[in-house]
Each structure stands twice: as C-alpha cells, then as structure tokens.
C-alpha cells in the first residue's frame, strides 16, 4: 500500500467473510505488451494423448514461455510427438528452433496422469533430459508450469517461476477479494472476501501462509491465513494501527508497523502472536518493514529525515546498531523490497507528480526507473529475482504489471474484466 502524506494510512474499515478454497469468478488475465530483446527460439510439439483432457499441458507450456519474454515459440505443427519418438533434430534446427520439446500425458488406472517430456538441444544435437510428473485433473496446470520451469532453467541457467503463485486484492463492485492464483493469473481461488478493502498480503517463505491486514473489527489487525486448511488466526491486535506485515526468512517472526505509542514504529511479533518487541525508537514515522534474505537486516520507510526515504537497521533493532539511509535518488521514496539474492532494492519514488518503480543496486547505489507507468505501488520480486510484480494504473483502471527487474522490456499488464486489482505479492518457490 502506497504511503500518503506523512506516511498516514488510508482510512479504511472492513467487514470480512472467510471464503477459503472458493473458486474465483473474476480472474486476472495477462496481456503481453512487450518482450525481451533476446529471445530463444523453441518448438514445443503437441503432447501425445492429451486431446480431451481438462487442461492442455502443451498450451500451458507454450504460454508460459511466451509470457516470460525470453522465448519465441516456433510453429511445431499439429501432430503429437511423444517423448519416446525418434526426433530429427536437424530438421527442427532448419525450421529455426534451437530447442525442441516432445512429451505425452497418459491416464493411469488410478485416474491420475503421468506426464513425461524430453527437452532437446537442436544445435548440439543432444538431449537435455526431462521429467516424469504425476498429476490429477486439478494439477495438470501445475505440471505444465513445472515443465516450463525446467525448460527455462536448462536453457537460460536460471530457475523458472511459472509454478509459483500470486496473491492480490480484486475489487468488483463493492466487494473485495484476496485471491491466490497461478503465476499466469489462472486457477484463482478466494482466500478472503470482504465488503471493504483488504491490504498488505505477504507470503510466508514456505508458500503455505499469507499474512494480511483486515479491518473487520473497525481497526487494522494483522492476520495469518493458512492456505492448505483455509483457517486464519490473529497475530497483532495492538492499540492503534497494526499494519505492513513482513515475514522473517525462517518464518518464525513477522515485522509489523504499529502505532501503539502514537507514531508508527517497527516491531516484531512471533508468528503465533506472542513475543512483541519494539525495534525502532524514533519520534518520526517508521513503517513498511522488509527483511533481507539472509535475515540480518530490516529495510523500512521513515520520514525521520523530513521526507520518506528507505533505511536499513539490524534485524535485532536500532539497539543493535543505528539505522542507515539507503536511498538518495529522489526526495520521496517508499515501499522497500529486496531481491532474493539480496543485491537489489526495489522501491517506489515520487517523480514528476507521479509514482514510479525504481530498482537500486545495493552495492553501487545506482538507481533507475524501470517502468513506463506513473502510478506505481506495491512492488514484489519473483522468487528468481528476474521479474517484479507491482500495482499501477492503465486505461484509468487499477491493474497489476510484471516487468523484468533490469528494465530490459516493457511491462506485461495483468487486469481483471469489470474490476480493479491491487496489493500484489509474488509467492516463493514451491517445494
């Protein structure tokens, strides 16, 4: 959630209804608006035996690769090619494909599916291996995402994030929904439904829980939602505002922003709700905490210098070391997020009357805007650090967008028909 003047929070009240596991009618749709400058040409043949199945694995793989902006899908024709087939790799190279994928989906006696595939390097004329996955009617999409992840890693040397999940808040009419979806916005499920706003969802490192802020008791309270069970529990209901939850890397602790004593300050609380501890001791407003991946530091937003900027302090708090200012490009910077490798800081900077997503190299201090939008908020790194998800406006509507973290390509816009979408958080790698 973007900070407003003096970092005050929006005046929100909510009354919430748990709807765990419900299918979402309004799903996020991905519109590809730009691709990377360097694309890997690949041909993915139709998988054998998938006609008539609930999900077409081949289509999911192709769509994932195209959406990444890193691949060009070469026409592989309509003839299915199983992984057991003899493949003329030279012929596929002649068609412009530097890699070729063959596979099959076979239904087993127990009703499950066995999904097999092989990835070939047509340039070196060799196999790059493959996987044998077990799936059900409801997990065929996941199998497709895992295949795309395998291809991405084998050909680009970086782990793919197609099998990760997103969380975000959709508003349709007067109803708000906290939704959990696949990385492509499909297979969306409702975690929480409300007649009023829901804010600040944050994934646990395990990907099984989401912390968020609810206003159902006429004040902001931090909850944790257990996704496998659909249950939730209260974590912080202190006097005043309870906001901006952020998980520690070991999942044991949440950093939160509380106005317990007046000005909003940074605290930590155990994930079970106990062990409250104050970390900042300033007379200013300190908010939006975020842990470094190694757990040593907490980055946060503070106006202690007169205007909002990003600072860093030891995870034990200012008693263990003074907070140090991190951002110096721009006079108004908020919403810190650290890349999974700890090398980059993403944040929102007020620029020319708008708000833009910036990325800063934490070693050199160099910072650059990476978007062509100007109402940006709520950045979130993909688990591999190669992309950022954020909220913005497009065509007068609140939408999400995904952009390479190096700014090498324009954003992909993610929107929902008939509604607005905000408060994104990109989930971790799934085990």
From Swiss-Prot:
This is Tol-Pal system protein TolB. Part of the Tol-Pal system, which plays a role in outer membrane invagination during cell division and is important for maintaining outer membrane integrity. Keywords: Cell cycle, Cell division, Periplasm, Signal. Its main location: periplasm. It comes from the Bacteria. InterPro entries: 6-blade_b-propeller_TolB-like, PD40, Tol-Pal_TolB, TolB_N. Pfam families: PD40 (PF07676), TolB_N (PF04052). One of its GO terms (biological process) is cell division. It is found in: Periplasm. Residues 411-431 are annotated as: Disordered. Gene3D superfamilies: TolB, C-terminal domain (2.120.10.30), TolB, N-terminal domain (3.40.50.10070). The keyword Secreted does not apply. The Tol-Pal system is composed of five core proteins: the inner membrane proteins TolA, TolQ and TolR, the periplasmic protein TolB and the outer membrane protein Pal. They form a network linking the inner and outer membranes and the peptidoglycan layer. Belongs to the TolB family. The keyword Signal applies. The gene is tolB. GO terms for cellular component: periplasmic space. It comes from Burkholderia ambifaria (strain MC40-6). Residues 1-26 form the signal peptide.
């Amino acid at each position: 959630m973007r900070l407003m003047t003096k970092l005050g929070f929006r005046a929100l009240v909510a009354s919430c209804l748990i709807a765990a596991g419900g299918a979402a009618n309004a799903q996020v749709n991905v519109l590809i608006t730009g691709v990377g400058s360097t694309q890997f040409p690949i041909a993915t043949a139709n998988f054998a035996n998938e006609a008539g199945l609930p999900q077409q694995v081949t289509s999911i793989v192709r769509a994932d690769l195209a959406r990444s902006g890193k691949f060009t899908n070469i026409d592989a024709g309509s003839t299915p090619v199983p992984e057991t087939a003899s493949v003329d790799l030279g012929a596929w190279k002649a068609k412009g494909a530097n890699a070729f994928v063959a596979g099959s989906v076979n239904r087993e006696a127990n009703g499950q599916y066995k999904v097999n595939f092989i990835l070939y390097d047509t340039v070196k004329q060799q196999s790059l291996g493959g996987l044998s996955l077990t799936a059900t009617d409801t997990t065929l999409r996941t199998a497709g995402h895992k295949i795309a992840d395998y291809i991405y890693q084998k050909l680009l040397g970086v782990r793919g994030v197609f099998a990760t999940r997103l969380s975000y808040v959709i508003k349709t009419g007067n109803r708000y929904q906290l939704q959990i979806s696949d990385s492509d916005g499909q297979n969306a499920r409702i975690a929480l439904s409300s007649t009023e706003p829901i804010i600040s969802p944050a994934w646990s490192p395990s990907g099984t829980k989401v912390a968020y802020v609810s206003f159902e008791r006429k004040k902001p309270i931090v909850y944790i939602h257990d996704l496998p069970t659909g249950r939730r529990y209260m974590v912080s209901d202190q006097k005043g505002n309870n906001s901006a939850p952020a998980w520690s890397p070991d999942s044991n602790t949440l950093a939160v922003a509380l106005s317990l004593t007046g000005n909003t300050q940074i605290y930590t609380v155990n994930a079970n709700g106990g062990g409250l501890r104050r970390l900042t001791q300033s007379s200013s407003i300190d908010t939006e905490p975020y842990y470094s991946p190694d757990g040593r530091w907490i980055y946060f937003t503070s106006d202690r210098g007169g205007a909002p900027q990003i600072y860093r302090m030891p995870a034990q708090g200012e008693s263990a070391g003074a907070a140090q200012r991190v951002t110096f490009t721009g006079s108004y910077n908020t919403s810190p997020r650290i890349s999974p490798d700890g090398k980059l800081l993403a944040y929102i900077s007020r620029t020319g009357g708008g708000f833009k997503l910036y990325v800063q190299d934490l070693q050199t201090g160099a910072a650059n805007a990476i978007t062509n939008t100007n109402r940006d908020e709520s950045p979130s790194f993909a688990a591999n650090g190669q992309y950022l998800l954020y909220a913005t406006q497009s065509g007068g509507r609140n939408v999400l967008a995904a952009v390479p973290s190096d700014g090498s390509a324009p954003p992909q816009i993610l929107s929902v028909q008939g509604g607005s979408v905000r408060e994104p958080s990109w989930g971790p790698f799934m085990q």
